[in-house]
């Protein structure tokens, strides 16, 4: 790993040097662009696009055709599970896409100096900001699909305009992914005049701000003026989500881009889809998204089953279990395992509650109880109020551990959220059923070109390289950094540590320096606030409970003597300016007062940052330090640590405790030396390594479902795009007839054939003419039977089409295919979730759980594909056009209606059609019969189990 960082440093220097000649070229062009009129500057975009078009027509036409044909071949290979062909075609497709990207990059590189010069000039004219040379380098790094590490205050928002404009010239749409919905609007609106001056459209997508909004989207339009009094987004014109994606540049949050992708793959009509292909994305604060958020999947779900009384039972039971005696806590892995005494105690308590079946918790009937028990213990030991969540208006709202923000609409999965609700005695919500899901990792790996910006990526360079194939380039600062980072001070306990923190806050405040204090939880921020109040120290608190005041608090945090206590949210994306927010020069008195404050803070030493606890990740610590010393300003930082801090307790306190006892330190005397700091850093590295393994593990497991998703979503697109479904369905019918004929005509002697069973089975699909019966079929050979039945099926299909009309039949084919695909895909996701939950037991059998999951997942996916064919064949003749129209309208309604969310803003899937499932529709046209068990003999007489024959 150390070799990795050594070579990383060398390559970074070479990368920067290689870009300097381009910076010189852009600077040489500056004067010529300054002399252009506004109309001539805007016309440059038309010129650039024309030049790119001429280049592409001669260099990429053949590649595009090959990509289209290879994609179609791959889809067919995936359907028939031809693994060797899939591997070959995937490699070919990857190579073709690389060739296309290389051609596009070469063409864009040819106009890069002029395009960057145009953006620099447009920015200077419209918003008064001229890109520094280092910002030009940052823009080039982003254009080349890499991560630009830029320190806080170096102007990442402005840097992004360069590659966004350049790549938008291809006309394929580009995305800027922000960390929150405020920045999705602010950055698009702030940079809007720059893009408008160049004739490029820019939009913003963000989550609902009010219950009446539906997929809110805005387009920057100087000719539009909002009628809302005091609207900060005066020139943001409301548009549809589809229009937002048609804009040249789209700003938005990762969740909105992700849920739009999932929603598009639930829609019943291609015309309702909103996204274009995923072309180029810049991810702001990329470490936050691809590292911190990577373990969190995006899920569209709907209410499924009632929560039941078990959550309340275990909420009453868990406080009666005692740590160590009844269960052992593993702090590192964050799980609790019952001891032998614990098992006995739990069995006794559950028996009293009357919920345990049999005499042992190990009985398979009690498997659900074990899941409830684990969730209840996790809720008790690892999920604390005002740390991991808050209780607000009778709801449990998750707190993002990395940003400190409330994650409205998000819920823990697999029953954990319900366990926490039961613990806090709020209403336990229904469990949910997953209809569509994708991890953040796989979502962003879909982009043809991905890059990002952050102030802290170097510590995770190895992970970015291994998982995302992204290189990190550290961009030099415009001015030398002068912030002083003091060594950590370690105390024996929390009480002594926070007393020292209050003393340092008071000292810095009296010097006229603003102080930012970072805490890891809401509880700690409020506890420190109470200590400051008792000392009479005026301060502001910024945590998830006061997130509405965030922009205002951060704007004032740089004033002389200002004290701000904040959780990790600390205004990421908003700079803390020394002296406070810089006013306009319209009011000379106000501006002069700000200048005096600004100078006063500079002379006092700038912003002082205090960290009250080391985070599990060094990046989060560095982000807090990075609030100070922006753009060459003075500043300082220091971390205070106690031996009973979470990270110390879990990963390193014993060694440091020994050092302190050896040194004879009392609780009020801190220790500060290199050995302690190194021990702390090593503890953080171990935690980072652990989380890296977890994320890598997540990718490997999700890749299994991702392959399934690619096949199903590609097939769905094909259905929506008007593919010839009739020939596909007739092929399925022929395949079913061939399979069933072979099954029922085994043996050399026709007397051994089960022709009654064959006729019964086929009559379950369509009604055979009276003359085609077992007696008539007995006179034919196996081949003749197949030909006769196939011909009859085709004639009956044509008869149905003649009766309903060709147009209606095509619509019916589409609806049945869509509904079957959607409903069975939902079932498959549930099967895969359950499989993943249980697969860990394979380790006890000395089998690799991942390999077992891949193998079992492959078997289940083949079963899914076969079941899709089976259900389509068994429904196409039976479902009438009236029911089909109901299905169409219900599908459209379901795809656009919001439902209970596991993540923000899901919509109900096309499959969720109340009362009009394929099964229900079929039953409405056939007589009721006694229900057949899946393991019962099939009534067709084949001798096989029902689930393996007609019950497939």
Swiss-Prot record:
What topology in the membrane does the UniProt record assign? Answer: Peripheral membrane protein
The answer on whether this UniProt entry bears the keyword Cytoplasm reads yes
So which domain of life are we looking at?
Answer: Bacteria
Q: How is the cofactor bound?
A: May bind 1 zinc ion per subunit.
Answer yes or no on keyword Nucleotide-binding: yes
SUPFAM superfamilies noted in UniProt: Helical scaffold and wing domains of SecA (SSF81886), P-loop containing nucleoside triphosphate hydrolases (SSF52540), Pre-protein crosslinking domain of SecA (SSF81767)
Tell me the residue numbers annotated for binding ATP.
135, 153-157, 575
Requisite cofactors: Zn(2+)
One function term, GO molecular function aspect:
metal ion binding
Q: Which GO terms describe its cellular component?
A: cell envelope Sec protein transport complex; cytosol; plasma membrane
The record's top EC class is translocase
Subunit comment for this entry?
Answer: Monomer and homodimer. Part of the essential Sec protein translocation apparatus which comprises SecA, SecYEG and auxiliary proteins SecDF. Other proteins may also be involved.
Task: Identify the HAMAP family for this entry.
Answer: SecA
Protein family membership: Belongs to the SecA family.
Q: What does this protein do?
A: Part of the Sec protein translocase complex. Interacts with the SecYEG preprotein conducting channel. Has a central role in coupling the hydrolysis of ATP to the transfer of proteins into and across the cell membrane, serving as an ATP-driven molecular motor driving the stepwise translocation of polypeptide chains across the membrane.
Q: What is this protein called?
A: Protein translocase subunit SecA
> Source taxonomy lineage?
Bacteria, Bacillati, Chloroflexota, Dehalococcoidia, Dehalococcoidales
